[in-house]
């Protein structure tokens, strides 16, 4: 299925890989000598990574770490595989988040996106984990994604600038029904809309398009 004018291909299912143990050796090609360790946890949550390719005994997975778009081949024996029916498309042009399940759109919401000086990054990412909201203004929870700001390297001395999906942070009026550019790159949703993303599991693909 294709979504919107950007012709995003929406799969019915996405294969996701959960890293077993402390980590798995990552290589630039299947069977090559490892060049990195793909950690079994990131921000104290299990690493659940979308699979983008397979070869006998190997899977190519997206990574949550910088730079954006990172991927690695890891041995299939070091992961457990599952199918994920969800897919998220964030269209910066219409300032909306679209949620799909089994290839069909089930919801879409107006979204607060990055301002021109701190734009929301474009590309293919995924849900890395659900985190506790640091304050009620962030909503019931924060969805940490694998996307990182291209213009901010260290947000509030956190050591990184990760793009998250969370509550409105006081910008409900600005977001309204049409969305708005109000953030430093994160995606802000009205609280009732955010809670509808609760069933989405870690590893769910997120495609951010212009």
Q: Where are the model-predicted features located?
A:
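A structural motif detector for short, solvent-exposed N-terminal "entry" segments of globular domains
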Residues: 76-115
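Short, surface-exposed beta-strand-loop junctions and turns on beta-sheet-rich folds
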Residues: 32, 65-69, 103-107
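Exported/periplasmic cell-wall-interacting domains
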Residues: 65, 78-86, 115, 124, ...
């Amino acid at each position: 299925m294709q979504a919107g004018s950007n012709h995003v291909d929406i799969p019915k299912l996405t294969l996701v890989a959960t890293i077993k143990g402390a980590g798995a050796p990552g290589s630039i090609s299947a069977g090559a000598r490892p060049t990195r360790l793909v950690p079994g946890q990131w921000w104290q949550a299990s690493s659940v990574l979308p699979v983008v390719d397979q070869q006998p005994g190997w899977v190519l997975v997206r990574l949550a770490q910088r730079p954006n778009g990172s991927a690695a081949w890891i041995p299939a024996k070091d992961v457990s595989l599952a199918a994920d029916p969800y897919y998220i498309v964030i269209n910066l042009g219409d300032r909306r988040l679209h949620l799909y399940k089994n290839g069909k759109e089930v919801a879409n919401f107006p979204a607060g996106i990055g301002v021109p000086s701190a734009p929301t990054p474009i590309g293919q990412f995924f849900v890395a984990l659900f985190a506790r909201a640091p304050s009620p203004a962030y909503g019931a929870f924060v969805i940490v994604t694998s996307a990182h700001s291209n213009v901010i390297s260290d947000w509030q001395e956190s050591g990184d600038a990760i793009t998250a999906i969370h509550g409105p942070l006081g910008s409900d009026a600005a977001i309204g029904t049409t969305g708005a550019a109000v953030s430093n790159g994160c995606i802000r949703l009205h609280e009732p809309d955010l809670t509808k993303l609760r069933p989405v599991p870690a590893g769910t693909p997120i495609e951010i398009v212009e």
